[in-house]
Amino acid sequence: MPGPVIIELALNGSTTRDQNRHVPRSPSDIADVALECMELGASIVHNHNDEPMFTETGEHSVASYIAAWQPILDRHPDALLYPTMAAGARGIPVESRWAHVEELARRGLGGMTLVDPGSVNIGLVSGGCVPPTGDQGCYQNTFDDVAYMFSRSAELHAAPSISIFEPGFVRIVAMWQKAGKLPPGAVIKLFFGADLQFGLPPTPTALEAYLELVEPLQLPWSVAVLGGDVVECGLAEIAICRGGHVRVGLEDYAGGAEPSNHELVRSAVRLIEQLGRKPATIAEARQILGAPSARPFGRIAGSCNVFECR
């Protein structure tokens, strides 16, 4: 019998309040919306803070994530949470871009890391225009970077959320699995580009192409549409019927309406129930992923040294 479906909520990304008045940006708003949406059926939560994706140092703040996550973990100690990371650029090592991910995992917070196993150009281009010269939308991760992120995820006993922006990314994951070095709990996130120009468009044929690569890996997988609506376009329904899971949220959404995260989660829940399934609980999501058990942690004190709060 088909099992429960994981709903991942991507709370905010780079979406601003000017673009959608409902998007949570402060740590307290992030915590509140995450908790409310978890009650509605979300079992994985992903958020950004206000650091830009392209920075001079590549560093993101640990303290900002702790401020947002602590209320969630107080209510749900086994919650599955993961941050973003700064985009790669020449001269900025992965150790800097991934430092906050590593520190959160070291503390046992969230239970997940993220691994983006390759490089990709991502840009918002419309009307058939050519991307402008000097565009900074190149997201770079070398083979060495990927090795670092997978190896540290395994050492930290954290489940990697693996972002697939191009089909070749799946082949890199397959190499790690074949070598027996893919960390436990890995989940494949298939990202399709609607308004954002990268990878494959959100069509049934594109999903089939991905599944030809993904299904032999026998890993849990989900679908997301960047710059679109994964439910409205029909991709979520096809994915669920094929055994996949779904990601929704204001990081990804683009459409004619101005929904809240709550409305997007409810939309996913309705679809799942119409298909005779149910949303996964946190415990069920952990079981589906095969994620390592949640490690105990204490409340994080308000003060800490520079390394811990960077």
Please state what every model-predicted region is.
Residues 13-32, 85-95, 135-140, 220-229:
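Active-site mouth loops of central-metabolism enzymes
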Residues 43-66, 191-194, 253-256:
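Glycine-rich, proline-tolerant flexible connector loops at the mouths of alpha/beta enzymes
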Residues 1-22, 117-129:
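N-terminal small/glycine-rich loop or linker at the start of catalytic domains
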Residues 123, 257-279:
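C-terminal helical cap(s) of enzyme catalytic domains, especially alpha/beta-barrels
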Residues 59-140:
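Active-site beta->alpha loop and helix N-cap motifs at the rims of alpha/beta catalytic domains
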Residues 30, 37, 48, 113, ...:
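Conserved, mostly hydrophobic/aromatic
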Residues 9, 56-84, 149-155, 208-218, ...:
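Alpha-helix-loop-beta-strand connector modules within alpha/beta enzyme cores
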Residues 112-251, 257:
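Catalytic alpha/beta core domains of metabolic enzymes, predominantly
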